[in-house]
């Protein structure tokens, strides 16, 4: 999986959904790995903002992914500031 950028909850959810599918996992099986319900995985993948940070970190670990924080590129920041 190549580096991907998520600038909002929905983009992050889509990235996690692709990663889960690439690993051949259903939402239910991922939920079992992190001891959460399938509905919790579904909410995270849908970009619902109420999902706890701890749950996000568990999902990242189960999918063998990591969170990287870096400065936003200026071009994207300028475009988003326009809206």
Predicted regions and their residues:
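Short alpha-helical DNA-recognition segment
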Residues: 24-42
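Short, charged recognition helix plus adjacent turn
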Residues: 69-83
């Amino acid at each position: 999986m190549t580096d991907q950028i998520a600038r909002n909850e929905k983009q992050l959810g889509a990235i996690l959904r692709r990663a889960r599918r690439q690993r051949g996992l259903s939402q239910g099986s991922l939920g079992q790995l992190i001891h959460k319900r399938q509905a919790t995985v579904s909410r995270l993948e849908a970009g619902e903002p109420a999902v706890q940070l701890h749950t996000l970190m568990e999902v990242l670990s189960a999918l063998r992914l990591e969170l990287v924080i870096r400065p936003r590129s200026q071009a994207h920041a300028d475009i988003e500031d326009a809206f």
